[in-house]
Amino acid sequence: MATYAVGDLQGCLQPLKCLLERVKFDPAVDRLWLVGDLVNRGPESLQTLRYLYSIRHSLTCVLGNHDLHLLAAWQNVERLKKSDTLREIIEAPDADQLLDWLRQQKLLHYDEPRGIALVHAGIPPQWTLGKALELAGEVEEVLRDDERLKLYLDGMYGNEPNKWSKNLGGVERLRVITNYLTRMRFCTGTGKLDLKSKEGLGTAPKGYKPWFAHKDRRSRHVKIIFGHWAALEGRVDEPGIIALDTGCVWGGTMTLYNVDSGEYLRCDCADDGTLRPPAQPTKLIDQP
């Protein structure tokens, strides 16, 4: 039995299947962890979601911002953008089945025996793992509640409040939790977010750092696997932090990480998110 984690798919099914074939992934015995952003912008969002649903019993995945955007469009609380490739999902005959399954997924997963957390964007420095799991659970509960789902999805968009406070309530509370777990890149040591900057490590606004770079980060004892930040190209220079979004949908690579051995496997992608020939994944022993 092996456990593999893969970076943002964004509807790029060919590279995922190429990687899984290379490691001889067997859904009957192996596990696949996904860091979110399963769909959108790539060429096969519907096919990707259908494939993941077909192996759902072997799958652990967390939701990313694009997945939440899909749920909002499905519930008619947000219009699709010109760059979105989600309409085929919403109009598919099995849309309700797929998206009802999608909204059951977590925002934060913790594998206690391994001491590993799986999240789309990250855990803010002022939260312990326990606090992050507790607050993620608040959003997860609403996503699974038919009566509160639309209200949450309608109110989740926006950059304010830009910092957590225990006094927050209602949709503002859920929005900042969501932004930390699915959109965060740079923040201050007290968790004030900058959600506009999207480039690499050396581009932090004054007073801000990558969320994982704060020396007093309270989840430092936990190994964290995340995606979301393609500009990092998998490089974080921080022990115990595994960045898996390597920009497949932008013509970069898709990265698979063996959770137990620490080995990486990468597959080159074309600008449209398909395989770039020759489709021979490259094995990497050490962190990129």
From Swiss-Prot:
Reaction(s) catalysed by this chain's protein: P(1),P(4)-bis(5'-adenosyl) tetraphosphate + H2O = 2 ADP + 2 H(+)
EC number, as in UniProt: 3.6.1.41
Gene3D superfamilies: 3.60.21.10
Example of a GO MF term: bis(5'-nucleosyl)-tetraphosphatase (symmetrical) activity
Top-tier EC class: hydrolase
HAMAP family hit by this protein: ApaH (MF_00199)
Family: Belongs to the Ap4A hydrolase family.
Protein name according to UniProt: Bis(5'-nucleosyl)-tetraphosphatase, symmetrical
Species: Pseudomonas putida (strain W619)
Gene (UniProt): apaH
